[in-house]
């Protein structure tokens, strides 16, 4: 029985690894950029419009967790006329758990990045909480690369899911000028006793005090009604802060009924794109 269970576990792990590796190459244009900030090579999946013209200007969407949900993004963008002039850039994770938590978790949220508390041996700041470095890679290396190889307009979106959603909120809070649209699907904003929620509220509050220099921003947040209570609580906290302080931010949020954590980002893609397109027109 033990041998059979071990074999079954091995097969299950092999299937998971295969699915991950199968998505480490895309059906689009794959490029590799050496990052001096991260001191590693980073692969990027690029979806160019079907009628791409080198001298034409295009909108830009950058999304984290580039290994995940790429097919859904492709199919939705193919159906929406407004997205025919958009370049989609997906940044895959190097290794699912380690570099994902390292790259996407904000530096002020280094504790308890799972729905169950980490044991002390796995709670080292070296393991996660370096979103500032990942953002520096996007700002200082990826965006300049894209701007030097493609003509881009001013419509730029950052999208993320779960830990990537907390990264979206972190980016919007610290360097809001990098993008004019932000999508946070099932954002894991509950980290460290809702630290991400609190920091986002602080950003909104400070922004509301001085509106003269604010650039136009739009934000779309979703969560599934069947997700973990911590996720739903964080979602409620974000909504509360937006209702109080949002002022000039164009935003909307949605609870997708009956959807769990892995299901919500699939449904959210079209919802977010429709919202963004309406907000800039």
Predicted features, each with a name:
Residues 17-281:
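Non-catalytic cap/lid and distal C-terminal segments of serine-dependent acyl enzymes
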Residues 2-16:
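Hydrophobic membrane-insertion alpha-helices, especially the h-region
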Residues 1-2, 257:
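Membrane-water interface of alpha-helical transmembrane segments
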